[in-house]
Amino acid sequence: MRLEAEEWREISYRHIKGRKRFRQRLFCGERISADDLNYNRPRVCPACLNERPIWWAVWDLGLVTACPIHGCLLFNRRPACRRKLAWQRLAIHQCRCGLDFRDLTIESADPDLVAINTAIYRAAGFPHGNAAELALANCGFPAQLLGLRLGPLLRLVLFVGP
């Protein structure tokens, strides 16, 4: 990608400067904790990659484990050998071993998991689809939860748990 320095800064997860803000990052314009990011292993939605081979930043959030657009679980391991996906790959959609993630069979996610991931996508400003919005409405989350900004929503989901 040929981006100017300012463009790179805009898409990076920058530290937020200031007193007691060392552990905060800027994620797509929203303040989140550094702990909210998934540094260990990448996750992908094969169906999303099949439609458009781009990396969605929302997949970098640690609590995002399902794709609300396709109602499926994200992959973080290769199905055959169960090895972790690597950050360094031949292409966004291709494993170092040559496996094309777009060819993987998707696994349906639990509707409640889809609903909470829809809330996260929405708070992060990412598209999530009409079906996901309907699943979110049927889940019965309080309006106050759905009105939270991304950082507080991630904290609440983390502390309340499943």
Located regions from the model:
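C-terminal accessory regions
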Residues: 1-162
